Amino acid sequence: MFRALTLKASARPVVAGLCSRQAPIAAVRYMSTPSPQDPKAKASSILDALPGNTALSKTGILATSAAAAVYAISNQLYVLNEETILVATFTGVVLAGIKFLAPAYNEFAENRVKQVSSILNSSRTKHVDAVKERIESVSELKNVSDTTKVLFDVSKETVKLEAEAFELKQQVDLAAEAKSVLDSWVRYEASVRQLQQQQIADSVVAKVQSELGNPKFQEKVLQQSVADVEKLLANLK
């Protein structure tokens, strides 16, 4: 009880001081305002700042808050002081900031969402185009089985021709090798025959020369020659 009386006594000079402070402020505001604001517009702005979806709910919230504030102040459950004014001023600044900055933030958010949506749509379009191009490139290969079959037949024929060509080449190489061996054998036989003939000729010449060096053979040849000459002379007579 004593505490309640003390609070009432301390609240009276504070309220009086606040009233004396608010009087010149109101006068200055009145003198600095160029034109009075429309009460309907001001009420609409206050209602718009309150939470809620309908005007009835916003009005109920405002009336309930005002009644609670009046009840708290009248019963001195809450003492109006400088902190209350500071909180009210801060709340007003915050609400004003929300009111004026919210549209700019909404515009920024909408632009950002549009930008991201544009990027996503562009990426989706590019992806769809890439998929379509891939489908078209794959559809061009729908006859790949027939083409592969033809190429396989051609490759089989090519392998067969290559095998035949390799076989013919082996035969030609074998014939050339056989001809080379035969030619070398003929050359060897010719060289052996020539060597044998040379040896025979050399032996005959050596034998004749040895016979010519024999005096008996020389005398025999001389007698045979004289006989031949006499025979020729006899025939001439």
From Swiss-Prot:
Q: Which SUPFAM superfamilies match?
A: ATP synthase B chain-like
Top-rank taxon of the source lineage equals Eukaryota
One Pfam match: Mt_ATP-synt_B
Which keywords has UniProt assigned to this entry?
Answer: CF(0), Hydrogen ion transport, Ion transport, Membrane, Mitochondrion, Mitochondrion inner membrane, Transit peptide, Transport
MF terms per GO, please? proton-transporting ATP synthase activity, rotational mechanism
What is its subcellular localisation?
Answer: Mitochondrion; Mitochondrion inner membrane
Q: What is its main location?
A: mitochondrion
GO cellular component terms given for this protein:
mitochondrial inner membrane; proton-transporting ATP synthase complex
Organelle targeting sequence: 1-30
What does the function comment of this entry state? Mitochondrial membrane ATP synthase (F(1)F(0) ATP synthase or Complex V) produces ATP from ADP in the presence of a proton gradient across the membrane which is generated by electron transport complexes of the respiratory chain. F-type ATPases consist of two structural domains, F(1) - containing the extramembraneous catalytic core, and F(0) - containing the membrane proton channel, linked together by a central stalk and a peripheral stalk. During catalysis, ATP synthesis in the catalytic domain of F(1) is coupled via a rotary mechanism of the central stalk subunits to proton translocation.
Family assignment from sequence similarity: Belongs to the eukaryotic ATPase B chain family.
UniProt name for this protein: ATP synthase subunit 4, mitochondrial
> In which organism is this protein found?
Kluyveromyces lactis (strain ATCC 8585 / CBS 2359 / DSM 70799 / NBRC 1267 / NRRL Y-1140 / WM37)
The gene designation is ATP4
